[in-house]
Amino acid sequence: MEFLKMHGLGNDFVVVDEIKNQNLVNKNLSDLAKKICDRRFGIGADGLVLLLPSEKADFKMRIINSDGSEAEMCGNAIRCVARYYVEKYNPAKKQLEVETLAGIIKPEVLENNMVRVDMGRPILKPQEIPVAVEEEPVNIPLEVLGQKFYFTAVSMGNPHAVIFVDSLAKIELEKYGPLIETHPLFPRKTNVEFVEILSPAKVKVFVWERGAGATLACGTGASAVVVAGRILGHLQEDVEVVLPGGSLFINWVFGESVYMTGPAEIVFKGEYFL
């Protein structure tokens, strides 16, 4: 099986093109992703990403996390597959439509390996995120291991709990991340973002991804952070989101789509023996 190793700010993926040859159609993708993503016994990645034929878009993207679970959407992965598709199939076409479990996502391939993505409008209704609260899911108290946090829940096609803190230096991500991810308030689990505000135009973020753990970057997470920060009155429309792997640039006007801009890098290509 031929593959590409790609990453968006260190959030890395094994990318497999199944558009013309569906070699994996009868494979257990959950088991395969666990093996491929293992950093000692496999290739090593945060997820396995497949490009598949689509009847309603340029192609379909599926993302299987390193734990074998399937994600609805991934902002870093969508940038990677958009760059790959344009370079492989249609260099003249810069604006794409990609079918995902979160709906049709619209990336635009720019110069210098940058990709701008229309992430769609954020979902803010509790039952649609989903989060088990009756009220608007803004600044909701949550206690884990005796530590009280306040989260704002946002869905960018996948659920996020955004937590603003005074300093990220005090946050033990590996300690609190998995407990918040699996908290009963989140029926489908959740991604978790801890956020330190540097200015109305710049934030620093640690990410705990549902199904992948601590990652160097998260595109939907960066988008959710800016949405939550705007709702709370902390942030302006254009924000640089500084992640461990680098910066993403997010734009959100109330009532409109969120736009994310960031890099997509090809590291190497190879063959994996099934």
UniProtKB/Swiss-Prot annotation:
Subcellular location: Cytoplasm
Name of the gene: dapF
Gene Ontology terms, MF aspect: diaminopimelate epimerase activity
Main enzyme class: isomerase
Protein's UniProt name: Diaminopimelate epimerase
The keyword Zinc-finger is assigned to this record: no
GO cellular component: cytosol
Organism: Carboxydothermus hydrogenoformans (strain ATCC BAA-161 / DSM 6008 / Z-2901)
GO BP terms in the entry: lysine biosynthetic process via diaminopimelate
Function in brief: Catalyzes the stereoinversion of LL-2,6-diaminopimelate (L,L-DAP) to meso-diaminopimelate (meso-DAP), a precursor of L-lysine and an essential component of the bacterial peptidoglycan.
Catalytic activity: (2S,6S)-2,6-diaminopimelate = meso-2,6-diaminopimelate
Keyword set includes Amino-acid biosynthesis: yes
